[in-house]
Amino acid sequence: MSLSTKDIVDGFWRHRPEDGFPPAPVERLEEYDGAERLNLACTQTELPPHRQQKLVEAWCEALPGFTRLRFLWMSSRVSQALFEAACRVPRLEGLYVKWGAIDDLSPVARRLGLRFLHVGSAPRITSIECLSELRGLEVLELENLHRVADLSVIGRLSDLEGLALYGGEKRWQVPDLAPVSRLAALRYLFLVGLRPANRSLRPLYGLEHLRTLRLDPSWPQDEVLDLQVRCPELRIT
């Protein structure tokens, strides 16, 4: 699966339910039909606590046995145990985690075939160094990982074509965008709520294949204008 023109403009993980991306959410194991796509929402239910726990435990046990599953959305709160179970799905190519109580990303490193990854709000995470194992990653989206300051690992993901870094209302503070400068294959980049200390977009000057850049209004206008002059084919929104 290569990125489409629409992916490059609006992002790979954009919602397109008319195409079953994601499919309808599933709460109970018996609702899953063995398809290649699964939208799992097994937490934040109205079940009593003991039944809720049993439900999550059942999914944790079952997920590693789903040999046909290729794309998994986890659209309710994700525990560390549930995340680790998802990372054991053998043929997984795409994983979307909306948000959760995850404090360790390292289990994802065992999924060397992973190509598309979104990690939503997970404020306990302090390091993304484990992503260095995912050399085949094509799309990476990280959201509200405010305790992560070192983005250097991103520069080693040379196959990345799509990158999104979201900070939300609380700005995500990082030193600079230097790691992004090494992503020669990058085609879209979303930087919303991210605040490099030097406020510079210069690391993007050499990204010849970059076609879409999404920024929030807080970026210095002189930086944005200079980038547009140097990269006239770049669409900045």
Q: Model-found features: residue ranges?
A:
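Concave beta-strand-loop units of leucine-rich repeat
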Residues: 2-237
